[in-house]
Amino acid sequence: SNRTALFQMLKAKAFDEGLLQESGIFTDRQGQNELFDRFSARIIFPLRNAKGKTVAFSGRILHASPADDTGYHEAKYLNSPETLLFNKRDFLFNFDKARSEIRRHSEVMLFEGYMDVISAWQAGVKNGVASMGTSLTEEQNRILTKTADKIVIAYDGDRPGVEATKRAIEILERNKHFDISIF
């Protein structure tokens, strides 16, 4: 896999290097004079704002690689860097598509990750969103408060998921707005 192929192709089409770097799609993390594809060898998820506009990306690694001699492991998920358009703390994955269904039933299913939301959507659950990791934030809570009265937390059953469920309940109970269930 050539991690510079996309950059080289866009550069050949006269895209501005500065804009390419600001896009978050590329990184110079490896200390080279050339930009590398940040999401190489990953499944890419477009991250859309509430209006449905793609503002960032997240990539899930396809194959876990063993640690190199520095002990470095690649992260399972890698997001675009935060920008004026994208702040992970303010963001709920799939909110743009789920909002009308959430409002119609005044209920939201809160999942841990993208794959959970996608699987639920394929099974007919159209009111699902993901908190982009294992922690619901106050900012995400404010978004949900404006949209639903009932929240069903469907985080993973592993230890991090259980701890995240406890933290989410603490945040959700502070505003006394939600009827909270755990799935």
What are these regions (language model features)?
Residues 3-151, 164-165:
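Phosphate-handling DNA/RNA-contact segment within nucleic-acid enzymes
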Residues 1, 36, 156-158:
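Conserved short loop/turn motifs at secondary-structure junctions
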Residues 177-183:
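C-terminal or mid-to-C-terminal helical accessory/interaction module adjacent to the motor/catalytic core
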Residues 165-175:
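Conserved acidic, small-residue-rich alpha-beta core segments centered on
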Residues 152-159, 178:
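Short, polar/flexible loop-turn hinges at active-site or ligand-entry regions and domain interfaces
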